Structures are given as C-alpha cells and as structure tokens.
Amino acid sequence: MIVRAWVGAGRLATRGPDLVGSCLLGLCLVGAPLAAQTQPTAKLRPEFVAIGPGPMTMGADATRDPQAFDNERWSAAQGEGTLDLPLFYLSRTEVTVAAFGAFVAATGAKADPRALDAPAAQPVAFVSWPDALAYCRWLEATLKASSGTAPEIAQHLRDGWRVTLPTEAQWEKAARGGDHRRYPWGDTPRRDRANYESAAPVAAGQIACPECAYGLTDMAGNVWEWTRSPYQPYPYDEADDRSGLEADALWVMRGGAFNDPVRLVRASARGAAEPGARRAFIGFRVALVAR
C-alpha cells in the first residue's frame, strides 16, 4: 500500500515503502522477537491520563506560526479555531512493541513481522490503521476482564466507555494543552524534549518532558500516531470521525516521526495515510472515550 500526501493546495504525490520521512505540498506524510503473552501485565497496561473537559485551540497559520502549512489554517477568515471537548483519556506513552506483541500472541492477529522485530520498549511501528483499531478492541476487552485495571478506568468501562484511537481534535488538545503553543512544551524547538531529525526511534517515554502538556511523552517525534479522523479540510467537524471508512479515506496521523524535520513535529502539523499503510515511522497511542 502506498502512502499518499499533499502539502497545501499542491499536487498529489506518492511514497513507496523505501521512503520513510518527507513533506510534500500542506498535508505531510509522512530487537528480538517477543515471548508470547496472553494479556497485559501491569507493565504493559497503558497509563491513561485525563484530559479535562473544556475549550481548545486547533489549527494554525503563518501569521502566528511561520512554519504552518496551508492545511492547518482553520478557515479563510481565521487561522485558528476553538472547540469544546468533553473529558477523555489518552495513554501517557505510545503503544510499545511489547504491548502489541501481547495482543498478537493472545489473538493470533496477523501482524507485519517487522512490527515485532524491534526492542520491546520502542513504540510499535509497521502497524496499519485496522491493526491499531484491532489492538484497541482487544485492550478494551482485557481491561474489562482484569482485576488490575485502575478503579477509575474500570468504572468508565462499566459505564460504556471504549478504548479506541483519539480523534484529531483530541490528539491536538492533548499535545497543546488547549492553548496556542507550537510544540507540546512551548513555542521553541528543543531536541532534548523530542526525538526528531534522528536515525531511529527511541524507547517510548525515554525522553522526559516535564513541560509537555498533561505530562504526555513523545507527542512530538518518535513515530507518527494514527487517529480515528479521516482527513478533511478544516474547519474540523466531529461528525467526520467515522470509523467505518476503512477503504475510502486517508486517515489523519499526528506528531511527526524520528526522521522528520522540526516543522513536522509541531502540535498542529497534519499528516495522513491510506489505512493499510505499514511503515517504519507510523505507530499509535490509545484513548479512552465516552461512547
């Protein structure tokens, strides 16, 4: 499957499997095998961080951020928009090779062999959009069945909440803290706060970022993260977050990757790929949301 990308209002472009990081015209695209495990241990269980309800800033333009791409602009009239989101939770780190390996061992899911052929603590890559959603469904079921699930999370699951991918808006609120910051930690690029312009991913959560919104790690760089939003021009519409479009949409990815330039790891930068894309620079993290 080929990853497709635009940058602004430019030409359609393609990338083959040998290409692992680039930006074309506003939309940018971008170990040893694990022992079998049947369900998450405490170490593999995600740490969910509450992202409180309230307003958020979404989008950017060159007036406020000279690095912004055209597809980040909210509308012809304004560079940024404001949304109000209810409470949701996001995992503190990206899903690791170890955690994804537990899912594969428990379910017999057909994973790309390269997804598990990496250090256990690294963020899993070579996962498609359906792969990520399948992991979410398995994780939800195992958390419901586990006596070790945090009481707050267990209660939400009993109340009908689900484990899934974050929407594009949820991801951006978590990355920006609801304000105008360009990066999860502020407005200035910092190589000590994110893994970008480098040769390979690092362990999920390895790079501490005490200034980052909500204490989340790797919201900039390391691997692009799938969302459950199909790519659409702004202004953002939550009604477009339809998880049944697997064959018909480009799906938004956020955060940039280890081999991307700093421009692509800004909190408002938007990437997208076809749902079947499995690449060395695409991973995900999980969300807990009300149905």
Each PLM stretch: what is its role?
Residues 1-15:
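N-terminal secretory signal peptides that target proteins for export/translocation
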Residues 18-32:
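Bacterial N-terminal signal peptides
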Residues 31-39:
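Bacterial Sec-dependent signal peptides at the C-terminal "C-region" and cleavage site
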Residues 38, 42, 46, 210-212, ...:
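Disulfide-stabilized, aromatic/cysteine-rich ligand-recognition loop
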Residues 41-112, 126-133, 137-140, 220-221:
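A short glycine-rich, aromatic-capped structural motif
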Residues 49, 182, 225, 283-287:
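Residues embedded in well-ordered beta-strands
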Residues 57, 61-72, 118, 123, ...:
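Functional-site microenvironments in short loops/helix caps that host divalent-cation chemistry
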Residues 81, 86-88, 181, 214, ...:
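Residue-level detector of short, conserved catalytic/binding motifs and their immediate flanks
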